[in-house]
């Protein structure tokens, strides 16, 4: 065991360099990173994708393979990780540090139930000193039924601690039987089973809706307060950082650009990159106005580097920035450090005066997006899309006898929805995961058929995609949440975009001309036409998906979580592209999202969904400024404030009821802080409150 430096913290990373060997040369994923985390401290690690955040975290716990640490040191609770034996590393991972991964499937084994996996982690922690490697890998680790029962009870207690409701009913569930939020909590329970001194959480909230995110952050905050667990939180969501972190480390291209207390970073960022990141956030821009962007992209981590890696994207860069040695300056008074050769970086600046710029005015001349208050574009009063009494139910019968006897269970995915989308507007559909948003979108696109009710596009009733003619099919474009999974990896960008054109009889020369036009519209170069999906960044792949969706000039485009997994800088570009396309082509958007800050910026109207029903529908400014339904209010209160000293996101307690067995009366009553006896007795009607329609007994004008 290597002695810890006298001034070290619980975690001390000094001048870390991690590289990957490839056939095209070494990839410099991490270049000279230094990070510390004190006992009981919560530190945020932020930056765009490709900045080296996850590789840094994996290097800390010795999971950097196939990469290698070529320089620097990592001290974790007195152990030099870079010099540790396999046994020492196992002890560290089982006792001192644990990791929560962005994708819980990296932690959860699909063939074992949740309780057994948590119990096994508890057992491994209890027997660290006596276990050999073979014993450590032995499954199952329990020698008797009584021992298994003991650890099972402890697993149930741990599940309750991370916020899994009714853990006794879920301890025997398999990962595929849990929602995304519950799987993430199960992964956290496994990580906390060893009672670690340091918890590394890698993008734990990226795919979660706002209320589940608030609940997860509250559990982390509570663990930190009650057990003194230090946390290294990796995220690209600066709202999450403002909510929970004591300090922030800003990374770019494998290097640390700036460090400091969270309040100072948010109020007075010093590095041009930090300022630009903050400027790209919708919360920092007037509703409906054009979002600033950061020109360019994170450089490829190959080849030799000179000067500041951010210089090619920085409008303040000098020749010294591009070619010289960049100093890291301590700001003093515990205000952190900044690595920048530009002298003004050492001076105090407001967070809104950085280097992010407009990415150019839209071709149509419009400088706004969505419904800027008091100045949005005129919208047609006649609806382009109508859903009248639409429901979608799924039979959960186990066999033909249940169907014959009518004793099968029914899942109510969408329940009696009335909704209109006017031509040229953006209607945002929001709500927690599992509320029926994507099913409603599938009913509009024809991927699903309503059990009852009617879907009309431009006044014409439409059925499934198989029943629609070519013209009706072309009326609706779709951008899926995961664009990579919707694109054939064997097709070039040109062929992927041209596929719907080919299906509609376009010849090759006409297709090629149209693809070039579409690439230009979504901001991609001609050279991207010959690229494959795996050769593109996340933002570029999403642009390809958008180009494909509008290839046949649809009147309405369904956007299912189009920017949820993107960094702030890439997200702002995509939102500007969508605004430009809408202005140029008079597109109508159904925008599905769990990111309410994005919805507030882009939407003309908002529809709030819960357990298959619409709780509230109204103009975006009215819904966000003065929510009518208690559920809408709860969603908005769950958004963490980006302003230092602002309120933290308030979690909505309790689990959503099952759509197989929804509660009688109002479906939200068991989680509603304002519920009255009549809420349990009768289902409320949809009522009009000025421009807003809401489904609630207790709301008054």
Model-flagged regions — what are they?
Residues 1-267, 344-625, 637, 671, ...:
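ABC transporter nucleotide-binding domains
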Residues 7, 23, 262-384, 397, ...:
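Charged, flexible cofactor/metal-binding loops and thiol motifs
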């Amino acid at each position: 065991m290597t002695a810890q430096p006298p001034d070290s913290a619980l975690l001390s990373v000094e001048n870390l360099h991690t590289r990957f060997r490839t056939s095209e040369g070494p990839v410099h994923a991490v270049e000279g990173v230094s990070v510390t985390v004190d006992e009981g401290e919560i530190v945020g690690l932020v930056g765009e994708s490709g900045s080296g955040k996850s590789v840094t975290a994996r290097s800390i716990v010795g999971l950097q393979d196939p990469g290698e640490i070529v320089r620097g040191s990592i001290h974790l609770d007195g152990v030099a990780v870079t010099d540790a034996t396999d046994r020492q590393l196992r002890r560290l991972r089982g006792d001192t540090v644990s990791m929560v991964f962005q994708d819980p499937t990296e932690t959860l084994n699909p063939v074992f139930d949740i309780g057994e996996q948590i119990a096994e982690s508890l057992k491994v922690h209890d027997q660290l000193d006596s276990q050999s490697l073979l014993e450590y890998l032995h499954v199952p680790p329990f020698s008797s039924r009584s021992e298994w029962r003991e650890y099972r009870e402890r697993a149930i207690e741990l599940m309750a601690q991370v916020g899994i409701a009714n853990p006794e009913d879920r301890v025997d569930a398999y990962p595929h039987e849990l929602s995304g939020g519950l799987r993430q909590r199960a992964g956290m329970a496994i990580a906390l089973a060893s009672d670690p001194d340091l918890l590394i959480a890698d993008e734990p909230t990226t795919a979660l809706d706002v209320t589940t995110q608030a609940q997860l952050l509250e559990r982390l905050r509570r663990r930190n307060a009650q057990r003194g667990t230090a946390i290294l939180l990796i995220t690209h969501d600066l709202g999450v950082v403002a909510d929970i972190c004591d300090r922030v480390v800003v990374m770019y291209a494998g290097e640390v650009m700036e460090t400091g207390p969270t309040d100072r970073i948010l109020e007075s960022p010093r590095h041009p990159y930090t300022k630009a990141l903050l400027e790209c956030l919708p919360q920092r821009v007037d509703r409906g106005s054009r979002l600033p962007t950061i020109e360019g992209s994170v450089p490829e981590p190959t080849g030799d580097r000179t000067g500041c890696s951010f210089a090619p994207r920085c409008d303040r860069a000098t020749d010294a920035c591009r070619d010289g040695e960049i100093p890291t300056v301590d700001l003093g008074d515990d205000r952190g450090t900044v690595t920048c050769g530009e002298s003004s970086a050492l001076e105090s600046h407001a967070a809104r005066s950085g280097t992010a710029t407009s990415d150019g005015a839209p071709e149509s001349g419009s400088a706004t997006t969505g419904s800027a208050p008091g100045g949005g574009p005129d919208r047609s009063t006649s609806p382009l899309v109508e859903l009248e009494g639409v429901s979608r139910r799924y039979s959960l019968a186990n066999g033909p006898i249940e169907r014959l006897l009518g004793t099968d269970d029914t899942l109510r995915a969408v329940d009696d929805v009335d909704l209109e989308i006017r031509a040229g507007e953006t209607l945002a559909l929001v709500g927690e995961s599992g509320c029926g948003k994507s099913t409603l979108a599938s009913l509009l696109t024809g991927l699903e058929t309503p059990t009852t009710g009617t879907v009309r596009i431009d006044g014409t009733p439409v059925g499934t995609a198989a029943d629609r003619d070519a013209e009706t099919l072309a009326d609706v474009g779709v951008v899926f949440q995961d664009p990579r999974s919707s694109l054939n990896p064997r097709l070039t960008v040109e062929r992927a975009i041209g596929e719907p054109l080919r299906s509609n009889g376009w010849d090759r020369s006409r297709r090629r001309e149209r693809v070039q036009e579409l690439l230009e519209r979504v901001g991609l170069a001609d050279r991207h036409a010959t690229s494959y999906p795996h050769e593109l960044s996340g933002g570029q792949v999403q642009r390809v998906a958008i180009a494909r969706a509008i290839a046949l000039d649809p009147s309405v485009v369904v956007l299912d979580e189009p920017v949820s997994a993107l960094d702030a800088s890439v997200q702002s570009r995509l939102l500007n592209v969508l605004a430009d396309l809408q202005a140029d082509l008079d597109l109508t958007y159904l925008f599905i999202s769990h990111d309410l800050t994005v919805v507030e910026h882009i939407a003309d109207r908002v529809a709030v969904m819960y357990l298959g029903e619409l709780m509230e529908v109204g103009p975006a400014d009215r819904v966000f400024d003065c929510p009518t339904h208690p559920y809408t209010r709860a969603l908005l209160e769950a958004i963490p404030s980006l302003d230092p000293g602002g309120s933290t996101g308030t979690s909505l307690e309790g689990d959503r009821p099952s759509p197989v067995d929804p509660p009688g009366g109002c479906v939200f009553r068991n989680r509603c802080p304002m519920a009255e006896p009549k809420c349990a007795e009768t289902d409320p009607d949809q009522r009009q409150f000025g421009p807003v329609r809401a489904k609630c007994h207790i709301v008054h004008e």
